[in-house]
Amino acid sequence: MTKLIYLIGPSGAGKDSLLRAIRQLPLPRLLVAHRYITRPAEIQGENHIALTPEEFAIRQQLGIFALDWQAHQCHYGIGIEIDYWLQRGSYVIVNGSRAYLTQARERYGNTLFPICLTVSESALRQRLRARGRESEQQIATRLQRAEDEQSRLQSDCILLNNDGDLQRTLSTFQSLLPFDRACAAHRE
């Protein structure tokens, strides 16, 4: 049975770095889905498709998103193509939303495999400051939100710590996947 790996975690936890590393793994049946976001594309940030709010709304009305939500004054969407990828036997990983986990669970049921990337408060503060996108007040708000969301995670959400070396996190990620050997065995 294929799985939709729903990677969540606070801004600054390292989801984008982990997703870039996952793309390099020799697992051809593990597909990383991009997101549609109403913010400009970034050179070093997430590989996403930038849309205006109007473009996003049109796609939303057309049912082009399998999942969509709003956070931090932006709209986020995951394309409906992930459903096709799952039907074709691929495993799919998406950069999800902690606040939208319940809705994702309702849509995907047992296919959903939630993984929460965690970091210590000090590491998160340092990363948010280093990227320079948020004010000190916004950083404080994000830190509080990270703590609040962490306390509300359901017990089936697997925790993956990313305080240290990315390669160690990647290795732990691979060990969490109950299907990575089967996924690798289907190389074409």
UniProtKB/Swiss-Prot annotation:
Organism: Pectobacterium atrosepticum (strain SCRI 1043 / ATCC BAA-672)
Pfam family, one: Guanylate_kin
Gene: phnN
GO biological process, one term: organic phosphonate metabolic process
Reaction catalysed by this enzyme: alpha-D-ribose 1,5-bisphosphate + ATP = 5-phospho-alpha-D-ribose 1-diphosphate + ADP
Record key words, sorted: ATP-binding, Nucleotide-binding, Transferase
Top-level EC class as recorded in UniProt: transferase
EC number(s) stated in the UniProt entry for this protein: 2.7.4.23
Taxonomy of the source species: Bacteria, Pseudomonadati, Pseudomonadota, Gammaproteobacteria, Enterobacterales
Keyword Transferase in record: yes
Database matches in SMART domains: GuKc
Keyword Metal-binding set for record: no
GO (cellular component) term, any one: cytosol
Job description of the protein: Catalyzes the phosphorylation of ribose 1,5-bisphosphate to 5-phospho-D-ribosyl alpha-1-diphosphate (PRPP).
Name listed for the protein in its UniProt record: Ribose 1,5-bisphosphate phosphokinase PhnN
